[in-house]
């Protein structure tokens, strides 16, 4: 039976290909070290796990949850936003729970995009921005993220006819895969642009708490008027090592939050309530665990940067995310460099072209691996590459 066009149009998911490659090498007896997928290697903090255990003892929490989330969970999210960013949110109308931010990012296009509609997406960028658009029948206009512009989209370069047709704009800072950060000045430009062209801004802020060297990432919603034109997606996955728990939220524009909630009520049955209680504990409990995690990633970041720079790269230390974005050496494409490292060194990296055409010529290293294994991976890379040129 022929699949629907929307499914046939989907590109192969980047990380699915990486997982298959790892499996093939392991079956061949290779000791593979993966620096590919950004999945934290340290455990969820103990007090969050204990809260899950306690909440799971209550039989009521094993019934169907609300598709938009318990009010107490949404209140905890709103209170966290007030403490962290000074942003006031109505937990009843401006917060919705998500099965991880990925789910909401994929579904928001279903709320606003009709077949043929246009969506602005960053390139390179998280593949789900485009995937959700394709599933909704829309088309994407790629906003190039260039190093000379700090990996921020140049809004002035977007053609007038494109801007007028666009329904949504996806942005993401701190940025995956580049590690770039954005200030409030940039977000102000985005709000102005969105108001001018009546575009809904969808800011993916999943890495806002993974920052270094005293830097604190702002929320898009801190900008005056941002709630008029946008929503922000966030998650407990990266901040508290809860990727497998599948819990996050969207906040901001009440109409967009309502649309997302109505869509979800027809598709899923919400987040397991015991996990929502654990999420409340994460947001309201001790935050020193987040600082400890960032300190660990900073150490690993420094290790990678120092090693690669010794080999001939000229990399600056990113202020956010747990990724290193670097150009491939002379003579390689993104794909051929990734293939070289897996074949010669048994080390998996993510080829930059998997994030879009503007990712060609780059690769991404994830810092979510035990430091001892990271050191071994870097030793293997140094052994098989030596000095490199660009």
Swiss-Prot record:
UniProt binding sites for pyridoxal 5'-phosphate: 101-102, 126, 176, 207, 235-237, 246
CDD domains: AAT_like
Alphabetical list of PROSITE patterns matching this protein: AA_TRANSFER_CLASS_1
Known catalytic reactions: (2S,6S)-2,6-diaminopimelate + 2-oxoglutarate = (S)-2,3,4,5-tetrahydrodipicolinate + L-glutamate + H2O + H(+)
Any Pfam family matching the protein: Aminotran_1_2
Residue sites binding substrate per the record: 13, 38, 102, 126, 176, 364
Cofactor: pyridoxal 5'-phosphate
N6-(pyridoxal phosphate)lysine, modified sites: 238
NCBIfam families referenced in this protein's UniProt entry, alphabetically: DapC_direct, PRK09276.1
UniProt name for this protein: LL-diaminopimelate aminotransferase
Native source organism of the sequence: Carboxydothermus hydrogenoformans (strain ATCC BAA-161 / DSM 6008 / Z-2901)
Gene: dapL
């Amino acid at each position: 039976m022929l699949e629907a066009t929307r499914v046939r149009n989907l590109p192969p998911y980047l990380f699915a290909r990486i997982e298959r490659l790892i499996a093939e090498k392991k079956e061949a007896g290779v000791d593979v070290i993966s620096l590919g997928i950004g999945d934290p290697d340290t455990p969820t903090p103990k007090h969050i796990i204990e809260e899950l255990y306690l909440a799971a003892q209550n039989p009521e929490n094993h019934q169907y949850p609300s598709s938009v989330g318990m009010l107490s969970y949404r209140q905890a999210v709103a209170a966290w936003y007030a403490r962290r960013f000074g942003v006031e949110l109505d937990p009843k109308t401006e917060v919705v729970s998500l099965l991880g931010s990925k789910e909401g990012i994929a579904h928001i296009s279903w709320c606003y995009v009709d077949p043929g509609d246009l969506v602005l997406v960053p390139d390179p960028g998280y593949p789900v921005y485009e995937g959700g658009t394709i599933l909704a029948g829309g088309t994407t206009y790629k906003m190039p993220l260039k190093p000379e512009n700090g990996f921020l989209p140049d809004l002035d370069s977007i053609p007038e006819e494109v801007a007028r047709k666009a329904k949504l704009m996806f942005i993401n800072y701190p940025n995956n895969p580049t590690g770039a950060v954005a200030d409030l000045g940039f977000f102000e430009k985005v709000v102005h642009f969105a108001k001018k062209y009546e575009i809904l801004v969808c800011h993916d802020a999943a890495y806002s708490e993974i920052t270094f060297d005293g830097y604190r990432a702002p929320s898009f919603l801190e900008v005056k008027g941002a709630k008029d034109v946008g929503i922000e997606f966030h998650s407990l996955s990266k901040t508290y090592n809860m990727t497998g728990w599948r819990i996050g939220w969207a906040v901001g524009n009440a109409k967009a939050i309502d649309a997302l909630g109505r869509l979800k009520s027809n598709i899923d049955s919400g987040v397991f309530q015991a996990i929502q209680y654990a999420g409340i504990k994460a947001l309201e409990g001790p935050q020193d665990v987040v600082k400890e995690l960032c300190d660990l990633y900073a150490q690993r970041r420094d290790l990678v940067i120092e090693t690669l720079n010794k080999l001939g790269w000229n990399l600056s230390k990113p202020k956010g995310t747990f990724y290193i974005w670097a150009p491939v050496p002379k003579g390689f494409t993104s794909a051929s460099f990734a293939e070289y490292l897996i074949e010669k060194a048994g080390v998996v990296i993510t080829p930059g072209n998997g994030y879009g055409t503007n990712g060609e010529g780059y690769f991404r290293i994830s810092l979510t691996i035990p430091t001892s294994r990271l050191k071994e991976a870097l030793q293997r890379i140094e052994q098989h590459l030596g000095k490199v040129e660009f």
